Amino acid sequence: MPSYLVETPQRCYSAIVERGIIGQTAQYLPPKTGKVFVVTTADVWKHAGAPLKAALAGIPFEILNLPGGEDQKRLAPVEALAEEMVQRGADRSSMVIAYGGGIVTDMGGFLAAIFMRGIPVLQIPTTLLAQVDAAIGGKTGVNLVSGKNLIGSFHQPLAVLTDPAILDSLPEREYRAGLWEIIKAGIIREVELFDYLSESRADVLARKPEAVDHIIAESVRMKAEVVSSDEREGDMRRILNFGHTFGHALEAETEYKRLLHGEAVAWGMRAAIYLGESTGYVSAEDSVDMLQMIEDYGPIPSLAGIRAENLLARLVHDKKTVQGKVHFVLPVRIGEVTVVSGIEEPLVFEAMRSALA
C-alpha cells in the first residue's frame, strides 16, 4: 500500500494509493463527526458510487449533487449546496467527502473551505486526472468568465484515498486526459517515469493493473513531495503549472465546453515546449522527445477555429500573472523545468501558433 505523507503548515495527511481503499473510508472519518455530506455528481454516483455507499453502511450520510462539466465550475452551484447543507442540518461538526473527478474535488474542497469558515474534507478522486493531480495539495476553487480558478482557497484534506480500481469504468477520453498530467510529472521532475511511459505505452493504454498502479503511485509521490516543500506556490510548486498557463487560456477561450482539462494541459505543454525551444531553454532533441510523448498518448481533439491572438489576450488574466508579467514554466531538459517571465509577446504568439498547427 503506497502511502505518501503531505506535510503542510495547515495539516499533515496521507495520500494513499491502494486498490480497494474506498472500502476503508469509514476509518478516515474523525471521531465525533456530525453529518457527512458526499459531494459528487449524479453520473459519478450512478456509475461509481457503489463502493463508497458500501463503505459508509451504518453511517448516515447525505448526497449533494453538483452539475457536471467544467463550464459549471462556478460559484453559484457551491452557494446552492451550502444552502442545502444548512437546510439539512449541517453544523461545524459536519464534514464533506468529495467523490468525483477534478471538478468535484475542487468544488467540494472549496465548499468545505468556506462553509462555517471551514469544515473537514476527505478527498476520494474517481478519475485519473484527479487522482494524480487535482485532489492532492489543498487547492480548491471555481472559475470566473475571465479565467480558471480565480476564486478559491487552500484547504488541505484529512486524507486522499486513491483507488486505481475505480478507473476500470472510466471512459477512454477521460483516461487519456489523466495520462497527460502524468506525462507532465515526467517532464518536470521524474525522468524515470518519463522513460517508463515511453517503454510501457502499450501496457499503460491497455490499463494493465501493474502499469496503472505504478504510474499513479509515482505521480502521487511527486505531487506530495512538491506540495510538502511549497504549499502555496511560492517557488517549487510553480513547476506543477507546466502546460497550465497556456492550457487555462485555451479553456477560457472555449468557454470550458470543448476540451477536458487534461486535453487543454496537453496542448499547453506543446506550446510551452515550443516557447522553451525558441527562447533557448531546451534543446531541439529534448523538445522532439517531449512532443512525441504527448503525441503518442493522443490525439488532442481538433482545435480548428482557435486563434492565437485571442489566446494571447487571455494570458493576462491567468492567476499566475504578477504585476502584469505572465510567468511561464518552460522545459530545460526532460526532468527539469524553469519559471520565466518577461518573454516578448511575439515569441509567445509564435509558440501558440505552432502548437495550434
From Swiss-Prot:
Q: Which domain of life does the UniProt lineage start with?
A: Bacteria
What does it catalyze? 7-phospho-2-dehydro-3-deoxy-D-arabino-heptonate = 3-dehydroquinate + phosphate
**Cofactor (UniProt):** Co(2+); Zn(2+); NAD(+)
Q: Which UniProt keywords apply?
A: Amino-acid biosynthesis, Aromatic amino acid biosynthesis, Cobalt, Cytoplasm, Lyase, Metal-binding, NAD, Nucleotide-binding, Zinc
Q: Where in the cell is it found?
A: Cytoplasm
Name of the protein described by the UniProt record = 3-dehydroquinate synthase
One example of the protein's molecular function in GO is: metal ion binding
Q: What is the lineage of its organism?
A: Bacteria, Pseudomonadati, Acidobacteriota, Terriglobia, Bryobacterales
Q: In which pathway does it act?
A: Metabolic intermediate biosynthesis; chorismate biosynthesis; chorismate from D-erythrose 4-phosphate and phosphoenolpyruvate: step 2/7
* EC number in record: 4.2.3.4
Entry annotated with the keyword Lyase:
yes
Pfam families xref list: DHQ_synthase, DHQS_C
Where Zn(2+) binds, per the record, is at E181, H244, H261
Q: What class of enzyme is it?
A: lyase
Function field: Catalyzes the conversion of 3-deoxy-D-arabino-heptulosonate 7-phosphate (DAHP) to dehydroquinate (DHQ).
Name the family the entry cites.
Belongs to the sugar phosphate cyclases superfamily. Dehydroquinate synthase family.
Name of the encoding gene: aroB
Free-text cofactor note: Binds 1 divalent metal cation per subunit. Can use either Co(2+) or Zn(2+).
A Gene Ontology BP annotation from the UniProt entry: aromatic amino acid family biosynthetic process
Any one cellular component term from GO for this entry? Answer: cytoplasm
Residues the entry annotates as binding NAD(+): T126, T127, K139, K148
